[in-house]
From Swiss-Prot:
It comes from Homo sapiens (Human). The modification Phosphoserine is found at residues 353, 357. This is Gap junction alpha-5 protein. The keyword Phosphoprotein applies. The keyword Cell membrane applies. InterPro entries: Connexin (IPR000500), Connexin40 (IPR002264), Connexin_C (IPR034634), Connexin_CCC (IPR019570), Connexin_CS (IPR017990), Connexin_N (IPR013092), Connexin_N_sf (IPR038359), Cx40_C (IPR031862).
Length: 358
């Protein structure tokens, strides 16, 4: 039989871009089909036509009877089965390699464009790092199947499953399950029914049952892979939105406690929210100067009424001053002010009644 290395190299590339179940299917294909078929089964069906004997000397009768008993050899039938079953995987492998290559080119173009934007002194990827840009693996080391790549993979599984079923049914209708030792031929040019004998029927039956069992196992693996991919997509479509909604409910807008702004002890004016969300001072400089002037005049009048003989206002810390009408208690002088013994006027060194010492 021919060399399987060419097909094996292609299937090794498919192994890199397959799911876990797909890798098991490829292992079964390599070991239990190609290896067994190329080593043991071929020796059992060596020169099958030469070992086929018939009880006749009629020219051409033996060839006609062999064609009736074996329309196609089991070995060649199984080779066709492996080729047709592997073809969808090869098509998927070609699409995967094309997709990865396009992704690599796109990332390289983005890297070159970013280098042009940054300038000539930027870092350039070496060849080894450029090859790593085509990595499509997830965190657990598996290939991320999504988009058109996932659709192609599912189609390849469906086609190979159909091929598998077709070849199993075809083998049953052509040969049945077991080979019989005696085959009765009634075809022309045989003058009468001729008895023909198959060589090594028991050994061939063992290989036939084994290959049918491997084909059934491959079919079950294909169905399991379809179920795995379908269940994964259904879980991603229905479970993840529910988890997202639950997270949104848990992390909803929290109602905070609005706390008022408390000014420092010597700070008599609080900032208020102005239009546009900005802070502004509700009192202008002119208003503050006018209020301070009014407070000073009021304190001067009170000092003259309490101590008519003195020209200074004495502020005692232990005594709480009365607040005149119309003056806000929040704008009175703080308790940190004290009397000053310095001269109050540059024009005269004598203290006058209108001088104010704070």
């Amino acid at each position: 039989m021919g060399d399987w290395s060419f097909l094996g190299n292609f299937l090794e590339e498919v192994h890199k871009h397959s799911t876990v179940v797909g890798k098991v299917w490829l292992t079964v294909l390599f070991i239990f089909r190609m290896l067994v078929l190329g080593t043991a089964a071929e020796s059992s069906w060596g020169d099958e036509q030469a070992d086929f004997r018939c009880d006749t000397i009629q020219p051409g009768c033996q060839n006609v009877c062999y064609d009736q008993a074996f329309p196609i050899s089991h070995i060649r039938y199984w080779v066709l089965q492996i080729i047709f079953v592997s073809t969808p995987s090869l098509v998927y492998m070609g699409h995967a390699m094309h997709t990865v290559r396009m992704q690599e080119k796109r990332k390289l173009r983005e890297a070159e464009r970013a280098k042009e934007v940054r300038g000539s002194g930027s870092y350039e990827y070496p060849v080894a790092e450029k090859a790593e840009l085509s990595c499509w693996e997830e965190g657990n080391g598996r290939i991320a199947l999504q988009g058109t790549l996932l659709n192609t993979y599912v189609c390849s599984i469906l086609i190979r499953t159909t091929m598998e079923v077709g070849f199993i049914v075809g083998q049953y209708f052509i040969y049945g399950i077991f080979l019989t030792t005696l085959h009765v031929c009634r075809r022309s040019p045989c003058p009468h029914p001729v008895n023909c004998y198959v060589s090594r029927p028991t050994e061939k039956n063992v290989f036939i049952v084994f290959m049918l069992a491997v084909a059934a196992l491959s079919l079950l693996l294909s169905l399991a892979e379809l179920y795995h991919l379908g269940w994964k997509k259904i879980r991603q479509r229905f479970v993840k939105p529910r988890q997202h909604m639950a997270k949104c409910q848990l992390s909803g807008p929290s109602v905070g406690i609005v706390q008022s702004c408390t000014p420092p002890p010597d700070f008599n004016q609080c900032l208020e929210n102005g239009p546009g969300g900005k802070f502004f001072n509700p009192f202008s400089n002119n208003m503050a100067s006018q209020q301070n002037t009014d407070n000073l005049v009021t304190e001067q009048v009170r000092g003259q009424e309490q101590t008519p003989g003195e020209g200074f206002i004495q502020v005692r810390y232990g005594q709480k001053p009365e607040v005149p009408n119309g003056v806000s208690p929040g704008h009175r002088l703080p308790h940190g002010y004290h009397s000053d013994k310095r001269r109050l006027s540059k024009a005269s060194s004598k203290a006058r009644s209108d001088d104010l010492s704070v």
